[in-house]
Amino acid sequence: MELILKYFPNLSDTQREQFAALKALYEDWNSKINVISRKDMDNFYEHHVLHSLAIAHEIRFREGTKVLDLGTGGGFPGIPLAIMFPDSQFKLIDRTGKKIRVVNEVAQAIGLKNVVAEQLSGEEEKAQYDFVVSRAVMPLPDLVKIIKKNVNRKNQHNSLPNGLICLKGGDLQAETKPFKNIVSLTEIHDMFKEESLVMPVCAASYTVRTSAARRGAVCGDEDGGEGRRDGRLRCWRPALRAGSGLSACGRRC
């Protein structure tokens, strides 16, 4: 818990209590249903909670923001984000019913009023949200295809354009190949000085914003863009046309 306060010192008393309660709750549920690797519970706050909160470092969801956590598993990143942003609304979905049971029980136990959890696949979820978040769910091209229908492109009221924010690892060279424009890539290690969190966060255009875990991430749109490579930071920005009124998402918003 001290690790969370190290990077987020301005938590309310309620938020502190909610974060502090998480480990015992997940240890109890993990003894019944394996939702987190049991050998990883000693690093619970670093590997799961703080990792999820890398998204909170990139964007502060404003009041009324609607967020879908696709493939939430045991509730990550959705539960930590819901604690961090009590005035935003979160829907957490997973195709595995026992994991959704854990999510519902944890949310109820810590008094989260802004979380709905349901057993659904990404393909089955039809509603629209300001942002879709995910954590190591599937190859990025597949993820983008699924979530395009779920992103509300009309109501833009956050500091970033509506879209996808995901924590993603693996061989990202192959995953990035179908995409042309990467908006930004940031190392999580630059946010949190913990040895095990050496992973980048990436943002992308096409109303899709992507955060990466461990090696990088992507997204893009069909418009041309200009890019730069700066050490471990790789950024691409949409090519803005004079008088086009384009936002950072690379499209008229």
Regions from the language model: what does each represent?
Residues 36-56:
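Conserved SAM-binding loop and adjacent beta-strand
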Residues 169-214, 220, 253:
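Active-site capping/gating segments
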Residues 53-137, 144:
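Conserved SAM/SAH cofactor-binding pocket of Class I
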